[in-house]
């Protein structure tokens, strides 16, 4: 038996089935860098409409984690797509390079306390730049389009000056002020925090009911000992008690229990007595709140006399309706006491320890949480503790250190949000869209209840607050003076603030005041003020405000989205973004948060080593990223399987049958109806893909392509094999098939480049095309409107309407050993199944589409073995009249003769 394999057009390509992405991807990335593909892309698009994704700066500290990968790769999808679809879309990455984490990380390496302020700042800058350079290399490994040469750092001189100018503008407009009042204080970071830096976690606390003995009651009560009863979950604040607040509209009851009197808000009496076991209490009388105002009592720890005040913040929902007030450690307490002229005494220092103002030798220098038990013991010993229990409740924590925070009164700088809130809400509602139906709503929730933003921090590594104080330590709110400070810093560098004497920043007006002493502000600005002014960099690159899109994790609704919205609205009277896209967090395969202690951390660079960056990118594209998404070995394997289908079924097979095709010579849209059908199917896919990219919906892109490849491989690729392998190499039918496959392959490569750019670049390099670009990234998405294939498609659709039913019949025939392969089959099809006259009149074409030996139409559908002879070249089965001899069909014989 003769071997006819040498006469066939067997598929061949150098594009490997095995991806070896960990080896190939770095080489492809090097190709992009050496050939300046990013620069050429921007040059190509420079006159097109801009689409600007403004990069939210990650923190320059440590290696990138899987959350970084999710964020940066999503951004790369956005930028890559727009650059390939008629937009000018530069990607300018940024880094947040100031703040506490850098100081903390550096303190583990060197003793910062031994250095001067500027020496510490120089060390912080050096460390931050090292971290940026490290992260750049790691981000590049993910396959990002940017060359990272154009970037912004919050420590850049021009950036800092822009930020200082923004501060000055806000000061001029009356949005910035200084005040002394309780703010969130992180003893673990030794600095004030803004609300956006607070996260809440459950924590156990002591909840206590405490007696505060009345000493002067103007004969309101009986002669029996009388106490005001308070409830608190912060026993450590009792040494700072300076008042008890009651609600002016509440009624208060005097009750008796075991020869002692107690005052409780009337609506809470029953709850109180059940909780503390006073069931057999005796009601004595009720009072209006104003009759209790100014009644004196003994503060239980300090033993000083204090008095009752009234304020509407007091609630009858829990506790006793009497609130212990420590104005240094509660904002409501502070405002309530301020109305009565009660002085605020801050008896806890920046480290969370009692200072000398506590006037208590046992408590002085004690950490505030450690004092809880000491205070409980004293209350018990003095019979002032009515009831004690441990409760679990939500407590504010420093989101960096994860330690609890307190309210602590300090002098701080604030931005008034109340003053700009109407403008913020207007621009949020009118100018901003979001991919999430709750996106704008969440932003609204985050901003509407914020009265102010504390922007001062008690650290050294950051942008200084450019304010000067007089000899009474009052801030000089002189705009000309502040502008002069910024001019000096612009000339000499921001470090000059920490290095030069105050006189270097004074204007002649103040220098002439020879007998006056002036002081520089020591605080720096909140890093959220740093990053919240990052939109200023757009102007340096001739890009317009606002940016088209901000894309970050959903935690940035309270962070960068929020701070940028506040400053941007103050400066430009509209939000700095048109579109908000928020992604969730990355969890492990079981849905748990990743942590080193659990051993469930997934390193994106390890994923790149094992699977390749393109599989990592495909996992991200294939995730519902707007919610928390999971990653595990099993999930990565599932996406690796999808990747293999794309690589081998679509890319490799298509390349292998295009090895003798030159588009500049052979390509044509004048193709058979089969090709028209698949081209039309691809065009419909392409339209949906473009829409999905526009909507930041990458999961739909993956699903669409996955289904298309399955459909393509299950019929069209199988159907064309005979023609591709067996027809003469230059047969017009082969060229029509290759034209369709070329078009689908090339545009699939383009469509998928935003998601798997390394693989599409590799496949593109094997695509024979005299007119192709230097890189796949320099290609453009095609205009789908040019496709109007209608003629002939209806016949293929009619075939598809019965395809599955006939294939099921063929499968049953194989199971019943009637057939070994479909091409042996003689199929009769019930006439009522197919309504297309063209197909009824062309049974040979229909047989070819079904891949069977013969088709006829009858009253019933049936599958039998045709018992035809097999051609040893094409392996199809033919009746005697279509065989040249016992080995070859007439078609194969003619082709071989042409080859000879």
Curated annotation (Swiss-Prot):
Stored SUPFAM superfamilies: Anticodon-binding domain of a subclass of class I aminoacyl-tRNA synthetases, Nucleotidylyl transferase, ValRS/IleRS/LeuRS editing domain
EC number: 6.1.1.5
PROSITE patterns: AA_TRNA_LIGASE_I (PS00178)
Stated name of the protein: Isoleucine--tRNA ligase
Binding partners and assembly: Monomer.
Matching InterPro entries: aa-tRNA-synth_I_CS (IPR001412), aa-tRNA-synth_Ia (IPR002300), Anticodon_Ile_BEm (IPR033708), Ile-tRNA-ligase (IPR002301), Ile-tRNA-ligase_type1 (IPR023585), Ile-tRNA_ligase (IPR050081), M/V/L/I-tRNA-synth_anticd-bd (IPR013155), Rossmann-like_a/b/a_fold (IPR014729)
Localization in the cell: Cytoplasm
Main subcellular localisation: cytoplasm
Cytoplasm listed as a keyword: yes
Task of the protein: Catalyzes the attachment of isoleucine to tRNA(Ile). As IleRS can inadvertently accommodate and process structurally similar amino acids such as valine, to avoid such errors it has two additional distinct tRNA(Ile)-dependent editing activities. One activity is designated as 'pretransfer' editing and involves the hydrolysis of activated Val-AMP. The other activity is designated 'posttransfer' editing and involves deacylation of mischarged Val-tRNA(Ile).
Residues involved in ATP binding: 596
């Amino acid at each position: 038996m003769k071997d006819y394999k040498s006469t066939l057009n067997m598929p061949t390509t150098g594009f490997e089935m095995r991806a070896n992405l960990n080896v190939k991807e770095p080489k492809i990335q090097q190709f992009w860098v050496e050939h300046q593909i990013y620069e050429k892309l921007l040059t190509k698009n420079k006159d097109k409409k801009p689409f600007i994704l403004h990069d939210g700066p990650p923190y320059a500290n440590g290696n990138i984690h899987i959350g970084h990968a999710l964020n940066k790769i999503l951004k790369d999808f956005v930028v890559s797509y727009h650059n390939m679809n008629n937009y000018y879309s530069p990607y300018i990455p940024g880094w947040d390079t100031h703040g506490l984490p850098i100081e903390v990380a550096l303190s583990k390496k060197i003793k910062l306390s031994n250095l001067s302020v500027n020496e510490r700042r120089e060390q912080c800058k050096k460390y931050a730049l090292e971290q940026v350079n490290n992260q750049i290399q790691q981000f590049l490994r993910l396959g990002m389009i940017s060359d990272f040469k154009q970037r912004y750092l919050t420590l850049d001189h021009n950036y800092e000056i822009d930020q200082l100018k923004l501060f000055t503008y806000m000061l001029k407009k009356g949005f910035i002020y200084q005040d002394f009042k309780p703010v969130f204080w992180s003893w673990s970071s030794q600095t004030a925090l803004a609300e956006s830096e607070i996260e809440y976690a459950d924590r156990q606390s002591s909840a206590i009911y405490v007696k505060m003995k009345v000493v002067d009651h103007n004969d309101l009560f009986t002669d029996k000992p009388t106490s005001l009863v308070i409830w608190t979950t912060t026993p450590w604040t009792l040494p700072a008690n300076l008042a008890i607040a009651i609600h002016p509209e509440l009624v208060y009851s005097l009750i008796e229990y075991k020869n002692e009197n107690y005052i409780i808000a009337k609506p809470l009496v029953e709850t109180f007595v059940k909780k503390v076991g006073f069931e057999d209490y005796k009601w004595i009388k009720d009072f209006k709140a104003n009759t209790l105002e100014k009644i004196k009592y003994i503060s239980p720890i300090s033993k000083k006399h204090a008095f009752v005040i009234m304020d509407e913040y007091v609630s009858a929902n829990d506790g006793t309706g009497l609130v212990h007030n420590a104005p240094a450690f509660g904002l409501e307490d502070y405002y309530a006491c301020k109305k009565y002229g009660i002085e605020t005494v801050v008896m806890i220092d920046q480290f969370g320890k009692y200072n000398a103002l506590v006037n208590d030798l046992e408590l002085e220098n004690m950490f505030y949480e450690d004092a809880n038990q000491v205070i409980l013991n004293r209350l018990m010993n003095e019979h002032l503790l009515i009831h004690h229990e441990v409760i679990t409740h939500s407590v504010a924590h420093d989101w960096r250190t994860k330690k609890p925070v307190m309210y602590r009164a300090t002098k701080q700088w604030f931005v008034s949000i109340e003053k700009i809130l109407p403008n913020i809400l207007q621009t949020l509602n009118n100018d901003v869209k979001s991919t999430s139906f709750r996106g704008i709503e969440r932003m609204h929730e985050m901003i509407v209840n914020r009265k102010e933003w504390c922007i001062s921090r008690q650290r050294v590594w950051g942008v200084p607050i450019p304010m000067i104080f007089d000899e009474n330590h009052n801030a000089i709110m002189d705009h000309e003076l502040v502008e002069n400070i910024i001019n000096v810093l612009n000339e000499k560098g921001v470090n000059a603030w920490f290095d030069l004497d105050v006189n270097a920043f004074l204007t002649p007006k103040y220098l002439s005041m020879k007998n006056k002493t002036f002081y520089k502000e020591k605080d720096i600005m909140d890093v959220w003020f740093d990053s919240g002014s990052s939109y200023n960099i757009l102007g340096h690159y001739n890009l317009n405000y606002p940016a088209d899109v901000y894309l970050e994790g959903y935690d940035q609704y309270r962070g960068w989205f929020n701070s940028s919205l506040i400053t941007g609205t103050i400066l430009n009277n509209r939000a700095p973004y048109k579109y908000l896209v928020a992604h969730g967090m990355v969890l492990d395969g079981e849905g748990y948060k990743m942590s080193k202690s659990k051993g469930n951390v997934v390193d994106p660079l390890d994923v790149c080593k094992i699977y390749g960056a393109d599989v990592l990118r495909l996992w991200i594209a294939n995730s519902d990223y707007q919610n928390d998404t999971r990653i595990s070995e099993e999930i990565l394997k599932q996406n690796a399987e999808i990747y293999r289908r794309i690589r081998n079924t679509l890319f490799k097979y298509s390349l292998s049958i295009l090895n003798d095709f030159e588009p500049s010579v052979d390509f044509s849209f004048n193709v058979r109806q089969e090709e028209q059908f698949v081209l039309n199917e691809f065009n419909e896919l392409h339209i949906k893909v473009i829409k999905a990219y526009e909507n930041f919906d990458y999961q739909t892109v993956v699903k669409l392509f996955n289904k298309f490849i399955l459909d393509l491989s299950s019929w069209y690729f199988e159907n064309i094999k005979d023609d591709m392998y067996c027809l003469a190499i230059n047969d017009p039918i082969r060229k029509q098939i290759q034209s369709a496959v070329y078009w689908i392959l090339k545009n699939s490569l383009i469509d998928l480049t935003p998601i798997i750019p390394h693989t599409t670049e590799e496949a593109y390099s094997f695509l024979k095309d005299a007119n192709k670009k230097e890189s796949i990234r320099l290609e453009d998405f095609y205009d789908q409107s040019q496709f109007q294939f209608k003629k002939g498609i209806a016949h293929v659709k009619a075939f598809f309407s019965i395809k599955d039913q006939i294939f099921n019949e063929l499968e049953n025939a194989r199971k019943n050993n009637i057939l070994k392969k479909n091409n042996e089959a003689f199929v009769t099809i019930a006439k009522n199944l197919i309504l297309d006259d063209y197909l009824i009149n062309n049974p040979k074409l229909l047989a070819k589409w079904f891949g069977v030996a013969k088709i006829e139409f009858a009253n019933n559908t049936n599958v039998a073995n045709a018992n035809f002879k097999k051609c040893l070249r094409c392996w199809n089965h033919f009746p005697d009249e279509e065989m040249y001899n016992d080995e070859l069909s007439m078609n194969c014989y003619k082709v071989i003769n042409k080859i000879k």
